[in-house]
Amino acid sequence: MTTKTTPKELKAKKESKKKGSAPEPPKNGPPRTSPPNTIEKKGILRSLSFQFSNLTRKKGNDYDLTPEEEGDGYGDEMGPVLGVQNYGILMKKYKRKNRSARWAKRFFVLKECFLIYYSTSYKKVFEKTRRIDLHPKGIIPLIGCSIVSGGDVDKKNCLLIAHPQLPSAIIVAASDHQTQEMWLKALRSATKISYKNTVVGETMIRELENRGVLLNEEKKSYEERLEAEAKARKEEHDRADELAKDKEELEAEREKLIRTTKKLKDDLQNVKNELKMTNEMKKTLEQEKMSLNSKTEHLQANMESLNIEKEKIHEQLQEIVREREKVLIDNQNLSTDKCQLNNRLMEIETSRNCIMTEKEKIENLLKMNEQKTQDLEKERQYYTMKTSELMDHLKEVSEQRDLTESELKEQMMARLGAEKQLQAAEKALEHLEMALKMTGAQMTELQEHIMPDVHKLREFFEQCAEESRFEANRTGIMRNAVYARKSIFDVAFSELDGHSLDVFEKFCEYNSQVLPVREKPQKLHKTWKQSSFKRIGSIRRSKRGIRSSFRKKTDSITTQPREKEPLMQL
């Protein structure tokens, strides 16, 4: 157990702390004020004294006779620019002794009550660093100055800075009217900063600091009181927690006692239930024994052993009342016997399940065989249908072939007759030419009129002869093409013998391109003959390929067993 401090001990510790150590000033509070005799320069006064240091490097220029100029100065220390009223580029007018006035661009910075100006190149440095250089081009103090806006000869937006102590007024020009107004407001507000205002501000700051110190001390005292009260409340809370813990422990012990009593009661009830279960198990075993005796003769020997065990169990049941451990042992023996019987029943069930699975397999095989027979019947019907279609088509092709052969014979006879006529016409033309040449000078005029017509007739007959020769050669070309197509089909069908029927049908459709004769009866004889010759070879070969593939498949069906036979995909 941890030792607890009483409120009296806490008060004694606090008093000893107060006596031993003086009160420290607050960390976040304002700094302590110095005695009234010593005057410290802070805030605006310090910045003014810094700005009146020897930055201009001139001894005789007394711009202001305020006490800030008589101080020690802080020229060596130059911190960051904490506040700048305005800055920017303005035009400054300057005039030397015997020369005309000129305007020059300068970078001006308004810091508190001083207007500092640099060269224009310093603008980038100032915007980056935000620090004032210790060596400017010039400094203009604005305390007590009068600032007026107006215009000059060349410039309109001008500002005039005048002071009785300055030798001449300073003129500055802005780029537009807006910047002029902005600079005018900033400069006039800067002229209001003076020594009196700074002194008043310092006194107000000191008063506020003193008030802050008093408030911090009061705050400390209140915090100490609150800490003491909080500690007292914490102690009371700790005591209450301890009491609650003790109460919880007592309740836990009470619950434990209740649980133990419940467990004992449950154990007694379980013992009673176990005894009842043993009696019930005995009855069930007797019933099972009677049923097994009636069912099978093989189990009679086992039932006799069970009867012997039953007598033993009766003896053991009498001992159970005296000893609980013996009852458990007897229960285990009975459970083992029951397990053996259950195992035998499970063996019978497993054998029955095996028979059922074999029966299902046989049924599935029968179904598979029936499906295969149906598929084969469909394939046979499909092949018969295809063969009948091909036979019909072959009949049509044979009729077309007979027609083409008769037409070819007629053409050959017509060609021979045309050749004979051409020969007779050529002989007649030769006789005419000879007769015309044999005539004398009297027939010159007739020759001039007749000879061109004779030449034209001769050219016409020569063209007809060439066309007849070309048609005679065309029949030989067609025969050669038919033989070549037959050889290609022989090779292709030899490769397609082992493939399925779908591949064979696609090949026939792609290569035959068979069109029935009835669809296009008005076609010319030449194209009809060419298509008929092409059809004949493809259809003959397709019929042979279908017969050979059908024979191979029927042979494979008869030779191979039906379980390993792959079904044809129609």
UniProtKB/Swiss-Prot annotation:
Annotated stretches, region: Disordered: 1-42, 542-570
Ranges for domain PH: 83-192
A matching Pfam family: PH
Compositionally biased spans, kind Pro residues: 23-34
Biased composition (Basic residues): 542-551
UniProt feature, compositional bias: Basic and acidic residues: 1-13, 561-570
Protein keywords: Coiled coil
InterPro entries: PH-like_dom_sf (IPR011993), PH_domain (IPR001849)
This protein's record includes keyword Coiled coil: yes
DNA repair found in the keyword field: no
Residues in coiled coil: 202-448
Similarity section: Belongs to the PLEKHD1 family.
Protein name as catalogued: Pleckstrin homology domain-containing family D member 1
Organism: Caenorhabditis elegans
Taxonomic lineage: Eukaryota, Metazoa, Ecdysozoa, Nematoda, Chromadorea
